[in-house]
Amino acid sequence: MMKAFSAKGLLIEQNHFQQILLRGRGDGSFAETINKEVSLLPPSDNLRMINNDKFIFAKQSFDQWSLICLEKQSDKEMLRLISAMNANEKILASDYSNTLYFEFTGENKDHYLSKLTHFDLRPKRFPVSTVAQTLIARIDCCIYHLQDKYLVTCHSSFEDYFKNRLQDAINL
């Protein structure tokens, strides 16, 4: 974990997680395969997520899931996980590790993140254990609402631009 930015009541840390993008119907054999490999059952509702100490598992659409590895996996283990999931012909799993991860924590995380997006971060609209796909600083991003923080993801090609926009938001 690398400290990226801080301000009064805000800490933003950049992480280097690994991610697997999954496609499938989410039926019984899908759930069984996923549970066998990562000990999590897939969320049934769109834009919901579940997590444990090792993974965040989110349903991003009716047939797409995102599995984020919170603990560093070896390349061999990532390949094994993807291969085990692809062994089920109803699942298409692919490595999606070209993603940036920023953790927003602190009492003012909503204030600063709101400067970069029009997305409604109020708990009534964006409860804990949900995920949203939205524009942040005009970049297509995902926001994962964990208990006391947000995990914001975007494609690695936007790293410099995203960091510059974060700095701009802090300086406003």
Language model region names:
Residues 1-172:
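Basic, glycine/lysine-rich polyanion-binding surfaces/domains
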